[in-house]
Each structure stands twice: as structure tokens, then as C-alpha cells.
Amino acid sequence: MIYPYKEHKPDIHPTAFIADNATITGDVVIGEQSSIWFSVVIRGDVAPTRIGNRVNIQDLSCLHQSPNKTLLIEDDATIGHQVTLHSAVIRKNALIGMGSIILDGAEIGEGAFIGAGSLVPPGKIIPPGHLAFGRPAKVIRPLTEEDRKDMQRIRSEYVEKGQYYKFLQQT
């Protein structure tokens, strides 16, 4: 369901796939070829949420903000299943592993990988191109070429799947 909130209505690019049971409300912008999967909740009723191009937000994830703190997800990011994002910044090509929680003011660097089940506390900065995981998340090592290839494969698969499901919605 897509809901306005006060004067704000979600702005969703026509090439984006939005699962029928996803909920999006308020000041939310979603870029081209992005995919919002089943049972995702994106609330833009406190502050803006900005989602770039070719971003995939997987099943059961929840996105929200604190007052005056935008939630930003840059192009080509992957947000795994059942992730909670709250007023964070997710840079280009980053991957957030399933079940992770990223809190207010945290910044996940370009091409960084947050391992499944991690908790990134408020204000924590994960450097570009690094693997971090744990509760709280700690930087473990730079990503390998194999890590980067896996992340690219996942991104590409989700763009393809999203476009397939978008096609099904239109038939």
C-alpha cells in the first residue's frame, strides 16, 4: 500500500518494483529499477527517506527515521531480509546483511559489507570497502575481490528479479 502522509506522497520511479504487500508512506523517494520486496515497511512520516537507483530492499525490512534526520540509501545498495534502518546513511554499492540493525547517524561506506545479524550503533562509521559484523559491529577486514564479485552478483540478480516481477504486475 502507498499512503500519503500530510502533504507528502511517496515519489516512486515507474521502473521500480513495489511488492503488493509492501507499505510506503510519506516523504519517500525511490529511484529507477529499485525493488521493494514483500512485507517491507518504509515510513517517511517523521523525516525524508531517499532511496537511489537499483537499490533492493528485501523482505520484511523496516525503514524509519528520527525527527530531522534523513534516511539515505545511495545507488546500487543491497538491504537484506529483515533489516532495520533508522536515520542512517548507506553509501553506494554497500550490502547490509539480513537481520542487521543500523541506527541513527551511522554511515556505511561505499562498497562496505555488514555481516548478517549485526548492530551498527548510532554515529558509527564503517569505512568504504570493508567487512564489519557483530553486536556492536566491528570492522573485520578489507573486502576481497571475491566479496565484491558476490555483492555485484546479488545486486544484478535483484535488479533482474525486480524487473521480472514488475512485468508480472503489468500483465
UniProtKB/Swiss-Prot annotation:
GO molecular function ontology, one term from the record: transferase activity
Lineage top rank: taxon: Bacteria
Pfam families, per database record: Hexapep (PF00132)
Enzyme class: transferase
EC number assigned by the record: 2.-.-.-
Signal peptide stretch: none
Disulfide bonds: none
InterPro entries: Hexapep, LbH_gamma_CA-like, Transf_Hexapept/Carb_Anhydrase, Trimer_LpxA-like_sf
Assigned keywords, A-Z: Transferase
Keyword presence, Transcription: no
Record-stated family: Belongs to the transferase hexapeptide repeat family.
Protein's recorded name: Uncharacterized transferase YtoA
Organism the protein comes from: Bacillus subtilis (strain 168)
Lineage: Bacteria, Bacillati, Bacillota, Bacilli, Bacillales
